[in-house]
Amino acid sequence: MDENNGLLLLELNPPNPWDLQPRSPEELAFGEVQITYLTHACMDLKLGDKRMVFDPWLIGPAFARGWWLLHEPPSDWLERLCQADLIYISHLHSDHLSYPTLKKLAGRRPDIPIYVGNTERPVFWNLNQSGVQLTNINVVPFGIWQQVDKNLRFMILMDGVHPEMDTCIIVEYKGHKILNIVDCTRPNGGRLPMKVALMMSDFAGGASGFPMTFSGGKFTEEWKAQFIKTERKKLLNYKARLVKNLQPRIYCPFAGYFVESHPSDKYIKETNTKNDPNELNNLIKKNSDVITWTPRPGATLDLGRMLKDRTDSKGIIEPPEGTKIYKDSWDFEPYLEILNAALGDEIFLHSSWIKEYFTWAGFKDYNLVVRMIETDEDFNPFPGGYDYLVDFLDLSFPKERPQREHPYEEIHSRVDVIRHVVKNGLLWDELYIGFQTRLQRDPDIYHHLFWNHFQIKLPLTPPNWKSFLMCCEQNGPVILQFSTERTNEPNRNKFSVENKA
């Protein structure tokens, strides 16, 4: 209120946090700042006498068993990680937070400093469950410079669309800024530093089960193909506009180099087309004079050289002739064995695990009925597997769909993955982004509250299965797993083969 008891409106226009304590760029010596691409979203930065690594995913799958590395990492990747002075991990998705990779690193350097943003869902929420022994994880506030030495500092910023989990980073060395927006949909709400020395971002698309894993209604192969084509083009145009607006000296498309290489995901691999980084680079060059760099594993960009003379032949050093660029084999078995270990777990001998799990999950008071069906590799019902309904309005488990009007979804999940997720209390991104489900829904509506809960808001500790099994022992003999037979599908809200509006 003002002095006349009137309402006083103030428009807040705070300064950009990276403009606080500004530092003028100093000339860089050749070789002083070098950025080496390892694979996917992993970069190895030499910054004077310090080394910093982004998002190390170098071995194993991401999202259960759905994503595998497209590029062959340099053979010295583990040495590079061990020599790092600090590591930045942008968010909790397993193509950025790779526990198989970190397990290798922790075996050599458990105390390596790792920095993450102070997100609502902690990046390392599942560290204890993972069994990885890391002892120097640092959670830092957003928008505040973190000083590494007199020449090097960094600042972590949140995403404007997914602030609960996504972050990006500004690294500054002797006044030269490197902006890595990673997977952020709207990094820092759209406010970002302009004319940085180097900017890098994702570009590929395809990091979702939609629409490839959907069927029924409008989800014909023709509709999916057109949707994917349109969405990929929209993403390319958005990235090109962002680069044009921010005017970095150099732009690098990365964080999109994955492939659905397991034979069981052949359909996804063929359907889920991704953007070509060179197409994005050509689009950028049409509208600006920004230098673009499409990296190959082991390629190194010398920032000092490139800023001084963009035509310098030594500005970008490609890997030696004959270096293997693309992976042609993946070690599937050790990771599939981990998933398969959940199949015969004692938990699933008791049908009451269903109520135990969904009560633990804590999602209810929402008018949605979901049918969960365990399947084999090819999404056919798994022999002896579970097939059940969950009514989230009152969190009940009826044998038939309720008579009231209700949205309905069917989620077919590969049995090894869904049981691994249930047993360990993991987020459903393992299923959805990992292409481990097939879905139908009626009506064709995205239930944000449901999916957001299971993808980001599940409890931070897994279900107490030890206590559950003790109760089962006290309450009587084992109830063998069952399959709910539904030979006559209910007519209510039955899926139509016609397209839905």
From Swiss-Prot:
Q: GO CC annotation: what is one? A: cytoplasm
* Disulfide feature: none
Output the Gene Ontology terms for molecular function: CMP-N-acetylneuraminate monooxygenase activity
The Gene Ontology biological process annotation of the record reads: CMP-N-acetylneuraminate metabolic process; regulation of Wnt signaling pathway
**SUPFAM superfamilies referenced in this protein's UniProt entry, alphabetically:** Metallo-hydrolase/oxidoreductase
Tissue expression per record: Widely expressed. Highly expressed in thymus. Not expressed in brain. May be expressed in adult stem cells (at protein level).
Q: List the InterPro entries.
A: Cnh, RibonucZ/Hydroxyglut_hydro
**One Pfam family for this entry, by name?**
Lactamase_B_3
Q: Where in the cell is it found?
A: Cytoplasm
Q: Does the keyword Secreted apply?
A: no
Record bears the keyword Kinase:
no
Q: Which UniProt keywords apply?
A: Cytoplasm
Where it mainly occurs, coarsely classed, is cytoplasm
What does it do? Sialic acids are components of carbohydrate chains of glycoconjugates and are involved in cell-cell recognition and cell-pathogen interactions. That protein has no CMP-N-acetylneuraminate monooxygenase activity and is not able to convert CMP-N-acetylneuraminic acid (CMP-Neu5Ac) into its hydroxylated derivative CMP-N-glycolylneuraminic acid (CMP-Neu5Gc), a sialic acid abundantly expressed at the surface of many cells in vertebrates. However, it may play a role in Wnt signaling.
The entry's family comment says: Belongs to the CMP-Neu5Ac hydroxylase family.
Protein name as it appears in the record: Inactive cytidine monophosphate-N-acetylneuraminic acid hydroxylase
